[in-house]
Swiss-Prot record:
It comes from Shigella flexneri. It is found in: Secreted. Belongs to the Toxin_15 family. This is Effector protease OspD3. Changing H148A: Abolished ability to cleave host RIPK1. GO terms for molecular function: peptidase activity; toxin activity. Keywords: Hydrolase, Plasmid, Protease, Secreted, Toxin, Virulence.
Length: 565
């Protein structure tokens, strides 16, 4: 998703044709007047670049794929017209572009065309003919390179001469305009001569990973489909970007075809490693993106490809780590963050086959699934799942690390604590965010871990460095469902009365009990639920008060007395 200030012009496009195709001056002059050569309109500035410069209302960065997706939606909604006022100002982009909504749109199944640099015109010509057959007047597609997203808009305009065929290429790095070319029915076949050079100069191609034998994917979602399918296959299955695109898009059939058709044993070690690494020009692996996007079947097919490849074990393990951004993120952390439970299970099966061959500390780091922010502060993957309420993903993660246990007991405890850089535990965030189902799932894997009672109690307390405990936060917020869930996992933990009463003290900063804060906040339903937990555990208020200092213990007992009366 590079954001770059590259200044293309019609002159550069012409120069490409002169240098690469030896086109005559007369032909160039003819093209200039015919509008067959893609150009920017004088009505809008092509210098404006707001890609990766604006966040949406949730604070998430708006990048090229979100801008391209929004452009496609506007093009389709308005039969080929786009209001560039929505793209021309940061505040307008913030108001109109939602990262979560665009991510949903991007992940909808689609018709896929693999397109080499020299074949852009062939595919555009094919789609125009398909539009004619179906009496369509406009259609928009996503164009995806290995590290950038653009949009393609096609229109058929009625004219007295039988119709004009308009091509629009939207590049988010020229945020408030598009390239345009126009043909008519008499010269429609000339579209087939268009290549990537007619739309992007060399600097753009290099930045977008399209230099030399570049490959793009044209993604057509205009007709709903239950699963993605490939209309145009890549000419070369050994192209280093083929498996990357297949993993990213969930194109299982393509991975299976490579496994079935390509004689992997005939490849050199270097070619085989490059093919299976499936990385884009920024070093981002296709396996990471498959985990991020939840493509379980594709990951399974990739595992079978690895099995048949004969790749040495060390290299195979290296690929399965699925790291990106210089080790800042891993595929497992992305799967946990997005709640892809089945994907985690599939990945877990691949990992467990080779776990015995992975050096222990590397395996531990891999399973912790750290995400490192911009200043290299670490956040464990399980924390994301707890914070976001992904209950099934939490259970899948528990199955991965516990069935059978892949680490020693101490490291399992650290994984389950899921403490981020500031020592805040994941369960605390789940309790704070009201993620009742996630809390219940956490209780399930806690029991599965078969830890000693002291460690289990420590994890259930979920206390940060400031003395803030999980139950304190739930009582403070007054979330009844969360407190009920906590009561259930406390009950199934089978702690001693002393341990259970300590947790029910629900201490916060300065030793204040959560009950006191709940009473002050008039969270009476939460208090009623809390008292039900105390009764269910056969714990007396006096046993709980013993864990508080004299003043807070006295206040606690006074409130309990007043409520009962």
């Amino acid at each position: 998703m590079p954001s770059v200030n590259l200044i293309p012009s019609r002159k550069i496009c012409l120069q490409n044709m002169i240098n690469k195709d030896n086109v005559s001056v007369e032909t160039i002059q003819s093209l200039l007047h015919s509008k067959q050569l893609p150009y920017f309109s004088d009505k809008r500035s092509f210098l404006l670049n707001l890609n990766c410069q604006v966040t949406d209302h949730s604070g998430r960065l708006i990048v090229c794929r979100h801008l391209a997706s929004y452009w496609i939606a506007q093009f389709n909604k308005s039969s080929g017209h786009v209001d560039y006022h929505h793209f021309a100002f940061p505040d307008e982009i913030k108001n109109y572009v939602s990262v979560s909504e665009e991510e949903k749109a991007i992940n909808v199944p689609a018709i896929i065309y693999f397109v080499e640099n020299g074949s852009w015109g062939d595919i555009i010509f094919y789609i125009f003919n398909e539009m004619i057959f179906h009496s369509e007047k406009s259609r928009a597609l996503e164009i995806s390179t290995s590290n950038h997203n653009m949009a393609l808009g096609l229109k058929i305009k009625e004219t007295k001469n039988g119709g004009d065929f308009v091509i629009q290429l939207y590049d988010p790095n020229h945020t408030a305009t598009h390239l345009r070319a126009e043909f008519n029915k008499f010269n429609l076949a000339k579209i087939k001569k268009l290549t990537v050079d007619n739309f992007l100069d060399e600097k753009h191609q290099k930045c977008y990973g399209l230099i030399s034998d570049g490959m793009s994917i044209f993604v057509d979602r205009h007709t709903p489909t239950s699963m993605s399918s490939i209309i145009r296959w890549p000419d070369n299955l050994l192209h280093p970007k083929v498996i990357y695109h297949a993993m990213r898009m969930g194109l299982t059939e393509l991975i299976q075809k490579v496994t079935r058709v390509v004689q992997l044993s005939d490849l050199s070690d270097n070619t085989l490693e490059l093919l299976l690494a499936a990385k884009n020009d920024d070093g981002l692996s296709g396996l990471l993106l498959a985990l991020q996007n939840g493509h379980s079947d594709t990951i399974l097919a990739y595992g079978e490809l690895l099995e048949t490849s004969g790749l040495n074990l060390d290299k195979t393990v290296e690929l399965l780590t699925a790291e990106g951004m210089g080790g800042r993120i891993s595929g497992l952390s992305q799967a946990l963050q997005n709640g892809h439970a089945e994907t985690i299970k599939t990945y877990g099966r691949l990992l467990k086959k080779r776990a015995i061959n992975i050096e222990y500390n590397k395996l531990k780091n891999l399973l912790t699934a750290y995400y490192y922010d911009e200043v290299h502060r670490q956040i464990p993957g399980l924390m994301f799942a707890l914070q976001n309420g992904h209950a099934d993903a939490i259970r899948a993660y528990g199955e991965l690390i516990l069935s059978p246990p892949l680490l020693n007991s101490e490291d399992i405890v650290n994984l389950l604590a899921s403490r981020r850089y500031d020592n805040v535990p994941g369960l605390l965030l789940a309790l704070n965010n009201g993620q009742a189902d996630a809390i219940l799932a956490y209780g399930d894997i806690l029991n599965e871990a078969k830890l000693n009672l002291d460690k289990k109690a420590e994890l259930l307390e979920a206390k940060d460095s400031n003395g803030l405990s999980g139950l304190f936060v739930a009582l403070h917020n007054g979330c009844v469902e969360t407190i009920i869930a906590y009561g259930k996992i406390l009950h199934t933990a089978d702690l001693t009365p002393h341990q259970a009463s300590k947790l029910l003290a629900a201490e916060g900063p300065n030793g204040v009990s959560g009950l006191i804060i709940a009473f002050q906040n008039r969270n009476f339903e939460a208090i009623k639920t809390y008292m039900g937990i105390i009764k269910n555990e056969n714990i007396t208020p006096e046993e709980i008060a013993e864990h508080l200092d004299k003043k807070n213990g006295s206040d606690f007992l006074e409130i309990m007395k007043n409520i009962k009366s």
